[in-house]
Amino acid sequence: MATSFSVPSMIMEEEGRFEAEVAEVQAWWNSERFKLTRRPYTAKDVVSLRGSLRQSYASNDLAKKLWRTLKTHQANSTASRTFGALDPVQVTMMAKHLDSIYVSGWQCSSTHTSTNEPGPDLADYPYDTVPNKVEHLFFAQQYHDRKQREARMSMSREERAKTPYVDYLKPIIADGDTGFGGTTATVKLCKLFVERGAAGVHIEDQSSVTKKCGHMAGKVLVAVSEHINRLVAARLQFDVMGVETVLVARTDAVAATLIQTNVDSRDHQFILGATNPNLRGKSLAGVLAEAMAAGKTGAELQALEDQWISMAQLKTFSECVTDAIMNSNGTESEKRRKLDEWMNHSSYEKCISNEQGREIAEKLGLKNLFWDWDLPRTREGFYRFKGSVMAAIVRGWAFAPHADLIWMETSSPDLVECTTFAKGVKSVHPEIMLAYNLSPSFNWDASGMSDKQMEEFIPTIARLGFCWQFITLAGFHADALVIDTFARDYARRGMLAYVERIQREERNNGVDTLAHQKWSGANYYDRYLKTVQGGISSTAAMGKGVTEEQFKESWTRAGAGNLGEEGSVVVAKSRM
C-alpha cells in the first residue's frame, strides 16, 4: 500500500520564506521608482536567483540619491551637470560644486586600465577596469567623508557654523561600454559595478567586438533586440542584488554606418541596399575577395570598394520605393496618391519589416523593384546602415521601457538634433529622462555658437528634458592643460612658477590641497593614534615640527601684497 508523503516543517518554512521574499520584491517593483520599468521576468525568477544570505550595498544608498537628484532636476527643467573624474583629487574638488560624478571608459582606457596598458577607447581593456576606477573614487569619497566628520566633531559649534559642509558622497555614474560580451558578461559587469560603488551605469548599442569611442568612425550597431537583452540583463542583476542602480541606455545610431544583423524589423527601415540591377550577383565581399586573390592590397582594394559603392546607388528601401513612384508613369496626382499611401503605411513608428514593405510596394504597382541589402555587406558581414536622429529616436522608443535614461550620442552640439530627439522620444515616452554628452570631441568654437549661447547650452537642453549632462573627458583635459602649462613655466622660472601658478592660486581660491597633509588625512590618523594610546602620542604626524604650520601664520613676504590686505595673509582652517 502506498504511503502518503508528509511535507516536513522545514520545507514549509523554506517555501514560506521564499514566497514572502517574492511578495516583497513585487511590492518593491510596484513602487513609484519603477512605475515606468518593464520586466520580461517575474519576482519569483529574481528570488530564485538570490542566495539565502541577504546582502546590502552602499552603492544602493547612492543610487537612490541619484534617482532623487535626477527626478528633481527633471521636475525643475534643470540638469545635473558633471564630468569625468580621473582621481581622488578631482572627485573631492568636484564634490564642492557638482551633484554627480562620471567615470569615463575613455579616460580609464587611456590612463588607468587594470593591466596598466594604455590605449584608445576600443573597450578592449579588461572588463574590471572601469569598476576598479569606480572603487578607487568611491573609497576616496568615503574616506574624505569620514575625515570631514572627525574634523567637524573636533570643532566647537561656532566653528562648525562657520565651516562649510561638503557632501563628498556624490553618486557615481559609470561607463559600462557595450556590456563586454554576452548576457553573462553583462550580468557579471553590473554585479561588479554595484559592489564597487556605482550608483548608475550606462550601456551602449554598439557591437562589443568592434566597439569604438562614440566620436570615432566605423561604429557597428547591434540589433535593437540584442541591446534590449543587455538592458534586461543589467536590470535583472540589479534586481537580484536588491538595488536601484540607475540604468542609462545609450544609442550610437546617429553616426553609425554599419549594423551586425538584419534580424530585427525595427532596424529594417535604416538598412541600405544596392539599387543598381547591373550589380546583381556581384556582391562587394565577392569582388574584394577576387581582388585579394589576384594580389591587390591596401589602396587598390579601397579604390575598388569606393567604386563599387558609387555604382551601387545605396538607398534605404523606403527611399527606393519613393524614387520608383516618382519616376513611374502616371499623372502627378496619381504619384502623389501612391506616395501618401506608402508614407502612411511605412511611417517610422510602425517599424514595418522589409517583407511587409515589399508587399505594400507590390500593391502600389512596383512589382519588379530591385533592392538588395546583401550585396553591399562588408567583408566582415555587416550590413550598411543609414544613421540619423530618427534612427536614434526609434531605438529610444524601444529602449525606454527597460532603462531610466536615454542618451543619444551626437557628432556636434546641435540644438535642432537635441530638440528633434527629445520631442521624438517623449512623443511615446513623455516621462523618460534624457542624458547628453557635452563632448570635448566637439570643436565648440566651430559650432557657430556665441559665448552666450555656449553658456546657455546646458540650461537650454535641460528644458527639453536632458536632466543629466556631462563632459566625458574634462578631467583628462584639465589635468593635461594644468601640467603642460605649469611644466613649461617651471622649466623657465623655477619655484616662482610654482608659487605664482599653484600655491598662491590654491590660497586665493580656498583650495584645501594647499594644506596637503591635512587634506590627505594626517589629522584623521593622528586621532586614531591618540585614541589607541589614551589621548596622547609622541609620534603624531601633525605634531610640533610639521611644516604645514607655516600655512597658519601671518606673513608679509614681498610679492604677496596682491594676496591680502597690505600683504598680510592668515590662512583659515581648511574647508574640510
Curated annotation (Swiss-Prot):
A motif (Microbody targeting signal) lies at residues 574-576. CDD domains: ICL_PEPM (cd00377). It comes from the Eukaryota. Homotetramer. Its cofactor is Mg(2+). One of its GO terms (molecular function) is isocitrate lyase activity. InterPro entries: ICL/PEPM, Isocitrate_lyase, Isocitrate_lyase_ph_CS, Pyrv/PenolPyrv_kinase-like_dom, Pyrv_kinase-like_dom_sf. It is an enzyme of class 4 (lyase). Involved in storage lipid mobilization during the growth of higher plant seedling. Belongs to the isocitrate lyase/PEP mutase superfamily. Isocitrate lyase family. The active site is at residue 213. Substrate binds at residues 104-106, 214-215, 250, 437-441, 472. It is found in: Glyoxysome. Its EC number is 4.1.3.1. SUPFAM superfamilies: Phosphoenolpyruvate/pyruvate domain (SSF51621). This is Isocitrate lyase. It catalyses: D-threo-isocitrate = glyoxylate + succinate. GO terms for biological process: glyoxylate cycle; tricarboxylic acid cycle. Keywords: Glyoxylate bypass, Glyoxysome, Lyase, Magnesium, Metal-binding, Peroxisome, Tricarboxylic acid cycle. Pathway: Carbohydrate metabolism; glyoxylate cycle; (S)-malate from isocitrate: step 1/2. GO terms for cellular component: glyoxysome. Mg(2+) binds at residue 175.
